[in-house]
Amino acid sequence: MKFLALFFLALVGVAFAHDGGMGGMDMIKSYSILGAMIGLGIAAFGGAIGMGNAAAATITGTARNPGVGGKLLTTMFVAMAMIEAQVIYTLVFAIIAIYSNPFLS
């Protein structure tokens, strides 16, 4: 956990490493990009864990009862689509936060 905190603090320096001349607007833009990156990373990480758990449960269920394998596979694909939709919603929110930020106009 300490490594992740140190890693995110190191990213702040990268976000502010330009020569900008707009003052506060550059800080808002930098924090928007940093927040979008962190949010999308968390969403992708959570989605990957959820997809892994869903696949593991489906494989376990199919191994225990091979007769319901097709039904479990269909249910798993629906669950995967719902998990991936949450990550795509986060991506859309991140793009909106970067490109149409109300604090930058």
From Swiss-Prot:
It is a multi-pass membrane protein. One of its GO terms (biological process) is proton motive force-driven ATP synthesis. The record marks 84 as: Reversibly protonated during proton transport. It holds the Pfam family ATP-synt_C. The chain crosses the membrane at residues 32-52, 78-98. The keyword Nucleotide-binding does not apply. Gene3D superfamilies: F1F0 ATP synthase subunit C. GO terms for cellular component: plasma membrane; proton-transporting ATP synthase complex; proton-transporting two-sector ATPase complex, proton-transporting domain. One of its GO terms (molecular function) is proton-transporting ATP synthase activity, rotational mechanism. Keywords: ATP synthesis, Cell inner membrane, Cell membrane, CF(0), Hydrogen ion transport, Ion transport, Lipid-binding, Membrane, Transmembrane, Transmembrane helix, Transport. It is found in: Cell inner membrane. It comes from the Bacteria. F-type ATPases have 2 components, F(1) - the catalytic core - and F(0) - the membrane proton channel. F(1) has five subunits: alpha(3), beta(3), gamma(1), delta(1), epsilon(1). F(0) has three main subunits: a(1), b(2) and c(10-14). The alpha and beta chains form an alternating ring which encloses part of the gamma chain. F(1) is attached to F(0) by a central stalk formed by the gamma and epsilon chains, while a peripheral stalk is formed by the delta and b chains. Belongs to the ATPase C chain family. F(1)F(0) ATP synthase produces ATP from ADP in the presence of a proton or sodium gradient. F-type ATPases consist of two structural domains, F(1) containing the extramembraneous catalytic core and F(0) containing the membrane proton channel, linked together by a central stalk and a peripheral stalk. During catalysis, ATP synthesis in the catalytic domain of F(1) is coupled via a rotary mechanism of the central stalk subunits to proton translocation. Key component of the F(0) channel; it plays a direct role in translocation across the membrane. A homomeric c-ring of between 10-14 subunits forms the central stalk rotor element with the F(1) delta and epsilon subunits. Dicyclohexylcarbodiimide (DCDD) binding to the active glutamate residue inhibits ATPase in vitro. HAMAP family: ATP_synth_c_bact. This is ATP synthase subunit c.
